[in-house]
Amino acid sequence: MSETQNTQVTKRQRTLVGKVVSNKMDKTVVVLVERRVKHPIYGKIVMRSAKYKAHDESNQYNEGDTVEIAEGRPISRSKAWRVVRLVEAARII
């Protein structure tokens, strides 16, 4: 009982998948995340959306790309998410 156990508690990161709608800022992309929600009274399925600014260190993601973002520590006043990976590249027409 005199031994101390070294237990690590890992906090699970919150991740979302969305589409890049803007990459005009340096090292930042704006990601649109859409989700489906059932209306509490009428029961209809409605789309809710939110835009998140995410950190893109190498400026490699373009508009239309589908990316996965993860929440982290605040990088700036409005940016606390970072791009984890590219899910699907935008189709060039």
From Swiss-Prot:
Biological process (GO), any one: translation
Record InterPro entries: NA-bd_OB-fold, Ribosomal_uS17, Ribosomal_uS17_bact/chlr, Ribosomal_uS17_CS
UniProt keywords, alphabetically: Ribonucleoprotein, Ribosomal protein, RNA-binding, rRNA-binding
Lipid metabolism recorded as keyword: no
Function comment: One of the primary rRNA binding proteins, it binds specifically to the 5'-end of 16S ribosomal RNA.
Subunit details: Part of the 30S ribosomal subunit.
NCBIfam families: PRK05610.1, uS17_bact
Protein name (database record): Small ribosomal subunit protein uS17
Species the sequence originates in: Bordetella avium (strain 197N)
Gene: rpsQ
